[in-house]
Amino acid sequence: MAATDHEVEEAVAKAREDDKSRRQVDGFDAGKAPPFRIGDVRAAVPEHCWRKSPWRSLWYVVRDVAVVVALGAAAAAMDSWAVWPLYWAVQGTMFWAFFVLGHDCGHGSFSDNATLNSVVGHLLHSFILIPYHGWRISHRTHHQNHGHVDRDESWHPLTERRYRRLPPRAKKLRFTPPFPLLLFPLYLFYRSPGKRGSHFLPSSPLFSPKDKGDVILSTTCWCIMLAFLLAMSCAFGPLQVLKMYGVPYLVSVMWLDLVTYLHHHGHQERLPWYRGEEWSYLRGGLTTVDRDYGWINSIHHDIGTHVIHHLFPQIPHYHLVEATKAAKPVLGRYYREPHKSGPLPLHLLGVLLRSLRVDHFVSDHGDVVYYQTDHHLNDTTTDDAHKQK
């Protein structure tokens, strides 16, 4: 039954009142348009940070491939259950590093040579069962619409109406680890809730007709890698392939989901999401969050410097730290300094758990909205939600 105009007006008023308490921290309004333009941020970044070196980028590929090969050879030679868990953790992290380099290829920050980017991107992403062009195109949509409730592509919030329609079991799974950390393969096939399409089919709503050849090429490469894994299973046994490749692959998926989620969620400041005329590329990009991963920063190519990356994805990863330092005086309070990590970023697990307890949906109404909490989802949400008000 359609809502009356009066009911809609009441809902809008309630949403604004609910969000008002979330909006200000120490007098700072995170949802207010910043006093600077994106050109001001761009001008603060040193000129050399924009330069791409294909040789330097290829060096990182060679380095990571050498580490992956060495780890695989060592684990296969020792073949000990005392070693396998350590191998899975380290090799899975290296698979994730492959993703980040392929991600740079997709943005064109790897080099100015589109052919080189495509070749390297396909090799790296096909190895970890990602259709390179299919993902590249959807990720471009994510960057072009970051922070937009309706148009963002990945990890965008559920509206309250859509959230209420989810079956109880679906709600529980979505916000209960480890399921949220295993969603990426499903996303490749089915996209996010409320969106249709697959990253493998050129007929998907994700793509335009001109993308057809690229999508078919990447899906073919994905199928070749899958066939290779099946052949290895026949030759050496499925258990050996599971130990050498399958478990590290799952670890890399967990890294991918953890990092991409926490770059857009979990900050104590309760960052805004936008609709309509309130959204802009700059305001959407400023809702992203930098994270510190300790000594893993260098292993996964400084992916934690996410704010500047989202504003200027063409900057190579090896310049992102310097570019971030240069831009911080311009960004001011719109840049949130990441919590300093220990050697291992174990603190981020607490951030993830807290966010999953309180960040459930946004209002159906309003152009500047904030995550709200379903207090009935589990017994621990209420206290956490009240602490944030």
UniProtKB/Swiss-Prot annotation:
A motif (Histidine box-2) lies at residues 139-143. A motif (Histidine box-1) lies at residues 103-107. InterPro entries: FA_desaturase_dom, FAS_N, Fatty_acid_desaturase. Induction: Up-regulated upon auxin treatment. Up-regulated by jasmonate and methyl jasmonate. This is Fatty acid desaturase DES3. GO terms for biological process: unsaturated fatty acid biosynthetic process. Residues 1-26 have a biased composition (Basic and acidic residues). Residues 1-29 are annotated as: Disordered. The chain crosses the membrane at residues 58-78, 81-101, 173-190, 222-242. Belongs to the fatty acid desaturase type 1 family. Its EC number is 1.14.19.13. It is a multi-pass membrane protein. Pathway: Lipid metabolism; polyunsaturated fatty acid biosynthesis. Highly expressed in root hair cells. Barely detected in panicle, shoot apex, stems and leaves. Keywords: Fatty acid biosynthesis, Fatty acid metabolism, Lipid biosynthesis, Lipid metabolism, Membrane, Oxidoreductase, Transmembrane, Transmembrane helix. Delta(15) fatty acid desaturase capable of converting hexadecadienoic acid into hexadecatrienoic acid (16:3(9Z,12Z,15Z)). The double bond introduced occurred between carbons 15 and 16 resulting in a terminal double bond aliphatic chain. Can also convert linoleic acid (18:2(9Z,12Z)) into alpha-linolenic acid (18:3(9Z,12Z,15Z)). Involved in the biosynthesis of the aliphatic side chain of sorgoleone, a phytotoxic secondary metabolite playing a direct role in allelopathic interactions. The histidine box domains may contain the active site and/or be involved in metal ion binding. It is an enzyme of class 1 (oxidoreductase). It catalyses: (9Z,12Z)-hexadecadienoyl-CoA + AH2 + O2 = (9Z,12Z,15Z)-hexadecatrienoyl-CoA + A + 2 H2O. It is found in: Membrane. A motif (Histidine box-3) lies at residues 306-310. GO terms for molecular function: acyl-CoA 15-desaturase activity; omega-3 fatty acid desaturase activity. PANTHER family: OMEGA-6 FATTY ACID DESATURASE, CHLOROPLASTIC.
